[in-house]
Amino acid sequence: SSHEVQVQIGNYQHKQISFDSTGKIDDDGRFLYRFSGVGRDSGTTVEHIDDQRFNLAPSLTWNIADETRLTLLGQFNRDDTGGTSQFLPLQGTKLDTPAGKVDYNKNLGDPDWEFYDKTFYALGYAFEHRLDDIWQFRQNLRYSKLELDNQIITAGGWSGAVSDDGSVSRGANVYDENISHFAVDNNFQADFSTGALDHTLLLGLDYLRVNTDYRWLYGSAPSSNIITPIYGRDFSGVTYGALQDYNQKRRNTGLYLQDQIALDAWRLTLGGRWDRLETDSVFHNASDAKDSRRDSQFSGNAALSYVFDSGFTPYLSYAESFQAEAGGSGGEAFKPSTGKQYELGVKYQPPGSDLLLTAAVYDLKRQNIVTTNVAGATEPVSEVQVRGLELEATGNVTENLSLTASYTYTNSKMTEVGDSRDKN
């Protein structure tokens, strides 16, 4: 058994208590449990914005037999905070104004009107059964529900938003989001050899259902001041328009096959996945327009590496992706995004150590990803290219000292865009 309680006290009146308890329920160890949780009450770097969280995550494992195990999983999370992102105006931050500079922690919203309330819960299980010395079966199932209510004020956003006396024009944003998520993954794994080749074969079928109700309302909020903010303004007269208001049901069925092959120090991974995506949408902000689309795609992946006795493992990988994009525009759902990524890297683990050092460079291209334009509307971008470098170190330096360090550099640009957008 293991039991841990942690208490934190920090800046901005930060107070947090967390616990993690795990152990046997019976003497034979057929039933195991784990129960963790977090309670937090804190301020933030933004004036008048609190950060409160309550989280519980219980789990129960039943070792039904030597070859069979079932783990029940649960989670509940409640967040109650405000608009920490702030959306400060260009004038008074990057640009000088006669009124002066905006302090980094200044709240240009209205704590009497703004809030961020999120409730999330999930239930599921993980089932494992070994059929024989070669085959084993796994099934993972999860249902989750997200409810989000958010009101936030955006300050500025255009060249004339701030007057010489510090008065700032603002926008009022109201978000309502409800997402239910059901996922089940079934797979068989086979470990076997063919001559000098050792195989780990994975064959699976998964299903995902996502129902989304999303609404984003926007209106002109009462003005404030970047130096002496005005709180407690009357928002009852604000007229809102729906930037987004839709109901969307997505169903994704995927069939996948992967083989990891080992020959002496060589490692080769070959895999493929076929997806069938069904999307049905109703856009209430577009005269209740209805849209149904059916998409399918094959995605492949491959990786090759060589494990040296010295602990170095250089590798090269290629992967394709196919992913649904939530929402739509003009009464039509967005196309799924696709991607291709090449990665070249090296891993180093000193013999007899659990310290792992990794360095990698990658080139990623994605098509049909969704972004938000300056008017607040979402729209697809034809193609984005991201190139980057990643360095990472993890492990235990000594028995009492662990290390986690990372560095990431990315360079992204739009390589194909519509006529109405400029390349960056």
Segment roles from a protein language model:
Residues 1-58, 64-68, 121, 355:
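Outer-membrane beta-barrel translocator/receptor signature
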Residues 265, 363, 380-424:
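Gram-negative outer-membrane beta-barrel transporters
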Residues 123-146, 170-283:
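Face-selective signature of the C-terminal outer-membrane beta-barrel domain
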Residues 63-65, 179, 198-210, 246-366, ...:
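Structural signature of Gram-negative outer-membrane beta-barrels, strongest in the C-terminal barrel
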Residues 19-23, 58-62, 123-129, 184-190, ...:
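Residues on the lipid-exposed face of transmembrane beta-strands in outer-membrane beta-barrel proteins
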